[in-house]
């Protein structure tokens, strides 16, 4: 009788986990439906202000990391749906221009842009309290260079570079009104050939106060002789997307 009881207990202990596993449904979000289709969001996580570039058949993405470390996490994809973490561009420390006395949630690394030029990857971002920074690497997995302060200034945010056919390098950016006392404008400055330093003042190329307030987050492209600036406006909850175009880098757009 004792042996029978032990056998029954053993059977119950081995059966219940199997039943539990057979009834378990994973709650992990999977955007790839497996049939050539997908559902949004493709990343069910906090990847604010994402930006991506394509190199051959590969896509690389980064996003705002604010005061968190490792910062500027790099994701890789072949199809823009399935993403894999491959590294971080700011793994150990934030740009050491000013060290706050206490953690500053929501500050530091805002709205980066990742680009590939002449065999190197570049990431530009704005620190709303310090200015525009840049890091670069030959391999997106790293190692990445130390952050370089490209343009100092309060309120400089949402930076994006453009390498023109004539060798000139430009940087488009917006302003955080909370720091600069100025917002709803898009500006452009020229950088040196190494893209490490601004060599001209920023010029306003678009003023959104009349019809496109809170214009920010500009992305800079050139195609078929036209310069394009894509940017959101109207604020996060009720905003819209604006596309600007000009034959001249400084406008009119």
At which residue positions do the language-model features occur?
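Bacterial N-terminal signal peptides
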Residues: 7-17
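Positively charged n-region of N-terminal signal peptides that target proteins for export
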Residues: 1-4
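Carbohydrate-active catalytic/glycan-binding domains of CAZyme proteins
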Residues: 21-253
């Amino acid at each position: 009788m004792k042996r029978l009881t032990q056998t029954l207990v053993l059977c119950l202990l081995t059966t219940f986990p199997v039943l539990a596993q057979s009834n378990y449904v994973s709650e992990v979000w999977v955007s790839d439906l497996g049939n050539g289709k997908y559902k949004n969001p493709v990343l069910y996580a906090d990847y604010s202000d994402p930006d991506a570039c394509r190199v051959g058949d590969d896509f690389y993405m980064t996003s705002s990391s604010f005061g968190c470390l490792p910062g500027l996490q790099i994701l890789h994809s072949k199809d823009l749906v399935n993403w894999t973490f491959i590294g971080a561009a700011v793994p150990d420390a934030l740009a050491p221009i000013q060290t706050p006395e206490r953690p500053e949630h929501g500050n530091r690394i805002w709205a980066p842009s990742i680009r590939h030029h002449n065999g190197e990857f570049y990431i530009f971002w704005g620190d709303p309290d310090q200015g525009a920074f840049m890091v670069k690497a030959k391999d997106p997995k790293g190692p990445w260079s130390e952050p370089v302060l490209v343009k100092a200034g309060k309120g400089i945010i949402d930076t994006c570079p453009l390498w023109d056919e004539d060798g000139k390098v430009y940087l488009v950016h917006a302003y955080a009104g909370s720091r600069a006392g100025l917002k709803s404008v898009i500006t452009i400055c020229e950088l040196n050939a190494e893209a490490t330093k601004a060599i001209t003042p920023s010029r306003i190329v678009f003023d959104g106060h009349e019809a496109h307030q809170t214009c920010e987050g500009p992305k800079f492209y050139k195609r078929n002789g036209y310069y394009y600036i894509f940017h959101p406006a109207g604020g996060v909850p009720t905003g819209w997307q604006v596309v600007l175009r000009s034959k001249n880098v400084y406008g009119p757009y």
